[in-house]
């Protein structure tokens, strides 16, 4: 396997860079040294890493939406509205689907059509096509830091252009932006692509420019057991730090049970620090991001606000550094700027009300933390064993062996053998373990919790239970109970 978790050699980076910057005409505008100078002239208040570190030190949970449209002026207006009317602490630039698949000619067609019809014909901002100077306008106008959010297996050119354009945060990873998003991209290939991205971030760090990196925590966003998403997050964190990344934000997608969600967001940075230290890394700063519910939403706006508020409460009580906000129009498609801003304000109201409160440690919360730690360590230890100490090699082999298995992912490189289901209290458990490397004690815990739900509902745990859980929140509940 032509893959290793060592820092990319300068010669290899330079060889790839020449190829990457020639993938689209705007790549020729990238000048690394000039970009470093541009970053150093930006005010500290626009740097993502610094603001996250300040929030972590002060115990603040920040709110950030998702948003992106095709044309520059319209996207600028959208960001202005979300900052001023939504009171967003951080702003996004969500990238369109064509750019995510490196289909820049089709993205250009979308730009042209958007200009023609007077509205966005793309589901995001095509940053590669707009180029470095346009990206700098996006950074210069808002008062708060702006992040690139996308879903791209090969995000090398996008990273070159947006980082040269002044963005100070970049989402994604070789696993989290492949397995949930693509069908035919090998994990080995996407990890290599993202080693390039992380090395680029590391090069900025070496020049004194801090760029935040954020692996995508929720994965498929559908009943993903915390230990599975934690395993991927920690691996991607290790791969990033190996290339010189220092500011790392690890993510988790809300499952819905408050104790499990709080336990998950509390254990994630501790597990990451544990394994980074175990592998000899010392120069890193870990913050956390909590994603409000990523599954199906109620169509009723009032009910959608309820789901948003529950996610905000879990983020606040879990002491996440940042929460990614949903809109009350989630079930209907791309939200209006007004709906998006309303979701942020709803979230911030909850965050402000709960900022001085904490969830006391109870026997059940302690148990959830213990189970997440033990399960995640089982996955990570087996992954390291498979890679003979190399986490990049181990990650590829772990997916091949089913040691890491993401529920409901489209990728043919994912086993798809595990089945999750909720227990009686809505916590996500594992109904079918596939090849997850859990001890018999861990498996028995999951079996007992799901069996208890089966007894409560008068039915045998089965795939129908899983289906019921997938649709439950859209129908106004957390646990998919059978109709009485």
UniProtKB/Swiss-Prot annotation:
UniProt: adenosylcob(III)alamin binding residues: 68, 123, 180, 297, 326, 330, 334
Top EC group? isomerase
Listed A to Z, the keywords are:
Cobalamin, Cobalt, Isomerase
Q: Entry's Pfam families?
A: Met_asp_mut_E
Report if keyword Isomerase is assigned. Answer: yes
Sorted alphabetically, which InterPro entries does this protein's record hold? Cbl-dep_enz_cat (IPR016176), Glu_mut_E (IPR006396), Glu_mut_E_C_dom_sf (IPR014714)
**Known pathway:** Amino-acid degradation; L-glutamate degradation via mesaconate pathway; acetate and pyruvate from L-glutamate: step 1/4
Superkingdom of the source species: Bacteria
Name the Gene Ontology molecular function terms of this record: cobalamin binding; methylaspartate mutase activity
Cofactors required: adenosylcob(III)alamin
Q: What does the UniProt function comment say about this protein?
A: Catalyzes the carbon skeleton rearrangement of L-glutamate to L-threo-3-methylaspartate ((2S,3S)-3-methylaspartate).
What family name appears in the similarity comment? Belongs to the methylaspartate mutase GlmE subunit family.
Instruction: Indicate what this protein is called per its UniProt record.
Output: Glutamate mutase epsilon subunit
Give the organism the record lists: Desulfitobacterium hafniense (strain Y51)
């Amino acid at each position: 396997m032509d893959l290793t978790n060592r820092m990319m050699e300068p010669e290899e980076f330079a060889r790839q860079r020449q190829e990457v910057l020639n993938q689209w005409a705007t790549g020729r505008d990238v000048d690394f040294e000039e970009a470093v100078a541009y970053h150093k002239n930006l005010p500290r208040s626009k740097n993502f890493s610094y603001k996250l570190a300040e929030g972590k030190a002060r115990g603040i949970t920040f709110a950030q939406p998702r948003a992106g449209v095709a044309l520059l002026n319209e996207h600028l207006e959208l960001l202005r509205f979300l900052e001023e009317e939504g009171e967003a602490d951080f702003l996004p630039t969500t990238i369109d689907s064509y750019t995510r698949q490196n289909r820049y000619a089709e993205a250009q067609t979308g730009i042209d059509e958007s200009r023609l019809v007077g509205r966005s014909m793309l589901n995001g901002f095509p940053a590669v096509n707009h180029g470095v100077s346009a990206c700098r306008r996006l950074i210069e106008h808002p008062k708060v830091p702006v992040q690139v959010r996308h879903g791209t297996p090969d995000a090398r050119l996008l990273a070159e252009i947006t980082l040269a354009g002044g963005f100070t945060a970049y989402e994604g990873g070789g696993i989290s932006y492949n397995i949930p998003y693509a069908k035919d991209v090998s994990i080995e290939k996407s990890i290599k692509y993202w080693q390039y991205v992380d090395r680029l971030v590391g090069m900025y760090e070496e020049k004194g420019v801090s760029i935040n990196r954020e692996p995508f925590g929720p994965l498929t966003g559908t009943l993903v057991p915390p230990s599975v998403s934690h395993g991927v997050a920690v691996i991607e964190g290790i791969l990033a730090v190996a290339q010189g990344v220092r500011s790392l934000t690890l993510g988790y997608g809300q499952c819905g049970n408050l104790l499990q969600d709080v336990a998950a967001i509390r254990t994630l940075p501790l597990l990451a620090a544990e394994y980074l230290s175990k592998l000899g890394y010392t120069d890193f700063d870990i913050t956390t991001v909590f994603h409000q519910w990523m599954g199906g939403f109620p169509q009723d706006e009032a009910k959608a606000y309820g789901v948003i508020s529950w996610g905000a409460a879990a983020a606040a009580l879990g002491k996440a550094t940042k929460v990614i906000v949903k809109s009350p129009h989630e079930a209907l498609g791309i939200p209006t700027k007004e709906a998006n801003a309303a979701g942020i304000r709803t979230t911030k109201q909850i965050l402000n009300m709960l900022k001085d409160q904490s969830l006391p440690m109870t026997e059940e919360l302690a148990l959830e933390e213990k189970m997440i730690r033990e399960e995640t360590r089982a996955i990570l230890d087996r992954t390291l064993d498979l890679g003979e100490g190399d986490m990049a090699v181990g990650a590829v082999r772990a997916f091949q062996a089913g040691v890491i298995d993401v529920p409901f992912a489209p990728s043919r490189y994912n086993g798809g053998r595990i089945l999750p289901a909720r227990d009686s209290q809505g916590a996500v458990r594992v109904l079918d373990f596939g090849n997850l490397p859990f001890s018999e004690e861990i498996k028995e815990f999951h079996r007992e919790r799901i069996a208890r739900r089966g007894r409560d509902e008068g039915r045998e745990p089965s795939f129908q239970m899983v289906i019921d859980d997938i649709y439950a929140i859209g129908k106004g509940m957390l646990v998919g109970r059978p109709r009485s």
